[in-house]
Structure formats: structure tokens, C-alpha cells
Amino acid sequence: MLFNANSRAASDITTLFQHFAQGPAADDSAIIKGDKDFNNPNDPNNLSDPKKWKFGSDNRIHAMLNIQSDDPNALSAKVQEQQALANKHGVQQVFLQSGETLPGPLTGHEHFGFKDGISQPAVAGFSPPDPHDPSPDQQAPLGHALGSPGTEIIRAGEFILGESVENDPTFPEQNFPPTFISSLNWMKNGSFQVVRRLNQNVAGFRDGITSALPADGSMNADMLGAKLVGRWKSGTPIDESPDKDTNLTDDARINNFTFANDAQGLRCPRFAHIRKVYPRDHDSFGNRDKRIMRRGIPFGPPFDQDASAERGLFFVAYMESIEGQFDPPPV
């Protein structure tokens, strides 16, 4: 409906934002993210195949409503209110996902046990800079956010359409003809949202770690898990504490570090999750213009409460370009 309402906007969106126009289940997008196997895209045993998604493939959605509250009763009442309003106006609910912070010692952690959401970018114009904490990156003149050591301030255009971006403060006006820009004015101050419902197989993760341990006993399961993630379960960076989990909570160290002294990945492997998604090396391609704003919401009970239940992470992210910031480039 959106495309039919404005054919000019539809053409421009398809040209500039191809993956958004195609949708997440399109072969190009699904293959490069690993949802489909490049060598066997129709594998019936592939649990990540878009055909098995709860939404986003055959169950296309046009909007997502996010309702949050610390009061379960208030939350339930608001959900019912919105459902009634949707029914009144002929809006069909495709899927409802409940999620909440995990209880007890897992508070702030995801189902595999690792502390989540530690490293987030700050946004220029929203987060004041710390005059006493400049970034070591010469390309980051805005420095670190006040009260958040290691949190670099990123230009708002990396998350909000129509604002200046890291590589070109004049974007988009200098890169496209005025007629092109004017047709996209309705998108200004908006953002592209990526939603992924990620199931987590806790038993499989634990078994995989155990089976991969070196036979000589030089590494235990906690250390191998930390090598894969780049942090111990407490959130302590393995670069700061390579031998054991020290439960580091100091803001000046838990996120304020680089891999400058570990170029070969001897402390934090180069394949570690946090190093792949945010290299922290100031000369890395796309280190600043590939940042996204992430929000993770666990769903399902902790594994130790009900091993058979479905569980995972409801991943939500905001960005200026799905192709440029979320989807990896084709190999």
C-alpha cells in the first residue's frame, strides 16, 4: 500500500534501500545472513529458513507495536486495550511476543548466561560529550559520552534519516539530486528497524562448548565461551582479564578498551562476537559508520527452570541503512 500511494517514492526506496524493499526473507538477504544455506538454500532441515519464521516471511507485517511496563498488570491491560483498538479498525494481529528481563543472577543477561547490552553508541545531539575524555580516534572529534567511558558519540545520521553521517556531514544533499531527496522527505527523522526473533538452544550451546574443549585440559568451558563472545559471563572483557572472570563492573574498564595491543587476537580472538561486530580499531573500515542502536529482550524462562521451553532473544535494532549497517556485504 505504501508503494502504490507514491510511485516516485517507491522507485527511490527500491533504488536506495533495496533490502528494505525486498524484505528479510528475500534470497539475497537471507543467504548473506545465514538464514539460508548458500549451497543448499532449500534444505528442509534448516531451522533458520524464513519459511519457518513466526513473522516476516509468509506472515508479512506492516507495523510493530512495542509495549513496555514494569507492572505486569498494567502491561496486560494495555496489550488488551491495543488489541481491541486494532480489531475495531480491522487491523490483524500477526504475532504476539512476550519478553522480560531474566530473574535473579541472570538479570541483565541473555539465556546463554552472558551480560548483554554493554556496548552501545551514543548519539550526537542527545548525549553530551565528556570534555575530559576525548576519544583516541582522530576521526571521532565528538569524543566519549559524559559519564560513559568508552562510549563514542556517533553522528545522528547513522541512526536517523536526514541527519549528517560519519563519512559525510553533508549527506544526503550532496550525494543525490534534489528531486530524489524531496521524494523521500516523508522519511526524514525516521529510522530503519530490524527485528529478529532468535531462538537460543542453551543445551546445544553448552554441549558444543564442551565437545570443543582441548583434550589437554588447557581451557575450561567458561574460558572457551569467553573466547567465542569476547567477554566473560559477567561482562568482563577477555582483553582486560584473559585468564579468569574477575566480575569487572568498573565503567572505566568494562567498555573503555581497544584491541590495539592484541592485533593478532591472542587475548581476544579476532572471531569473537564483540570484535566482529565492533572492531574498536580506529583504522578498521566502517568502524564508526557501521554502528547500530541495539535493544535485546529475552523471551522464555531460564533454561534451569524449564529445559524444554522455547527461549531466545527478541533482537531490535535501529539504523540508517539495512544494507550498509546490518546485512553483511556479499562474499
Residue ranges and their predicted role:
Residues 1-331:
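Long, low-complexity, Ser/Thr/Gly/Pro-rich intrinsically disordered segments that act as flexible linkers
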